[in-house]
């Protein structure tokens, strides 16, 4: 009986002990503060009752806000020489510190917020100084990111498509290297309030496999500062320079090789018989017109600039060679027909010669004498008073030398034809050699001497 009572006593004490412990835990749980909901936390952090004013920059009346920028290039293309601009699609990322947004009440180290919250915080007034057109992306939702860290750091990322101005120097076109810039500038805050700077690591990133149709995007990207001075103050500005080397493949196929073949085609006339005037003239005119069309086509996609481009020199020289080939046949034809003109002139002169003109004949001494032989009167018909005939009046008995016999028409024809053929033979060698020398100078000058260095840009 005694042992039973003792056991019941210990059991009762155990029940009372656990009951008291459970009661204390329940009281502690009821007295512990409840975790704050995300909505309550955001209202406390940047709501109306938080005292946060998005119209006032961080560190107001204090040091300027340092904004670190980074861009990621999704696509790069549509480089237009006529309008001198280029199109690019990027992620623009800005990071700065806003002490008013630092927190300890929430367990997460960072908060990814809805883009609608962007209107509730202060943001830098960044714009692109050389922008000609731009738009945001809203498919399927606003392509914007807002992230706030525990220490008050803010990350703002946005996807935009830009059309930026890119002044081009086309003197070496199509063997040129162009430098296109992207300038990021503050619109309203001077450097006393806001300073832009490039991110130390990976300030400019390019998507893997990014290729351009006519250019090679150089890996060297110059990151510079371009502080702007206006009447309203000194404004922060940073810029990125993209070096683009043009690929010649398209222009070799579409311009250089066709024009080269046209020039070579014009030389075929040197092997065509000089009497085949329709064939040689037709070939010459066709090549000239084709070369003119080719030259006009090369300028169609380029702006009207005041200086001479490399492609202009090539087209002009090719047109000159083609036109010279046509003029060469004109010279050949003229020389080959000279004997006919000379014979026609001689016949015309003999036809209009009057018998009275034979009264005077010029000997080698240039003395004029009457010639009575035209009237059937010999020298003995006229006697002077002293018995000396008139013909012997100059007191010399020497006879005039016989004139050199003139060449026959057939000999003259062969002479002029040989001269014309000689012009063709010289042209067969001279034209290709001259064009080869031009090519040597042209490619050496534009590919070696005047080759552009991106580091000197």
Swiss-Prot record:
Cytoplasmic side stretches: 273-277, 331-425
Subcellular location: Postsynaptic cell membrane; Synapse; Perikaryon; Cell projection, Dendrite
Extracellular side: 29-250, 299-309, 447-457
Any one Gene Ontology cellular component term annotated for this protein: presynaptic membrane
Signal peptide: 1-28
Entry membrane topology: Multi-pass membrane protein
Domain topic, free-text comment: The channel pore is formed by pentameric assembly of the second transmembrane domain from all five subunits. In the absence of the extracellular domain, the channel is in a constitutively open conformation. Channel opening is effected by an outward rotation of the transmembrane domains that increases the diameter of the pore.
PANTHER family assigned to the protein according to its UniProt record, in alphabetical order: NEUROTRANSMITTER GATED ION CHANNEL
Protein name: Glycine receptor subunit alpha-1
Record lineage: Eukaryota, Metazoa, Chordata, Craniata, Vertebrata
Gene symbol of the encoding locus: Glra1
